[in-house]
Amino acid sequence: IPAKAQQTPDARKILDETASLFTSKGGVKATFKADNFTEGNLQGSATGTMCIQGNKFQMTTPDMITWYNGETQWSYMKANDEVNVSVPTPEEQQSMNPYTFVNLYKEGYHYQLKEKTLRGKSCYEITLTARNKQKSPHTIILDINKDNHNLMCIRMQQRKKGQWTRISIQQLHTGQSFAATDFEFNPKDYPQAEIIDLR
């Protein structure tokens, strides 16, 4: 099916349905695989889990745990027992939390809608292209399951051409309950960690 013109009403409706999974049904827990590419060459990969509630998240990979409570971010590096504390910019949030698209798509992007098959499932492929060429991410491609509107894959191109991130969602569970403390670093759990405050 050929791509439809820019602000496709169907694409917006599909995006609204997918976004509602993250905003109206409690928290979300996902397992994922993230790959970073430069000029088509794989630069690095990571697998992990992510817990999301509104604009808060906790992400765990083999090397790092990140907590974000909507304002402050803590990144714990397992290898050197170190915690970086920061207040991320919106652009930094987008690179850490793929679900920022929940608000991102609503303004500043054109849409294109196609249909495809991914992992044996029928999907919508929606390409978001920034109207402002200086905006980052410049291009976002979302693969959305046609049956339940779950997000299956996100590809993001940063403003610098040739740099892509692909996040494949392996499992997605909606309607999860999380405590506020799930999104904050607890120093009692890491008594030996060196805390580096970058705020």
Predicted regions and their residues:
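Short, exposed beta-strand/loop patches in secreted or surface proteins that constitute
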Residues: 21, 48-51, 65-66, 111-117
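An acidic-aromatic
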Residues: 47-96, 161-166
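N-terminal leader/targeting segments and the immediate start of mature chains
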Residues: 2-42, 53-56, 189, 194-199
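Flexible, surface-exposed loop/linker segments and immediately adjacent secondary-structure boundaries
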Residues: 88-121
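Gly/Pro-enriched, hydrophobic low-complexity segments
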Residues: 109-198
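Extracytoplasmic
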Residues: 25-27, 45-47, 54, 68, ...
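A generic structural motif
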Residues: 33-37, 60, 76, 129-131, ...
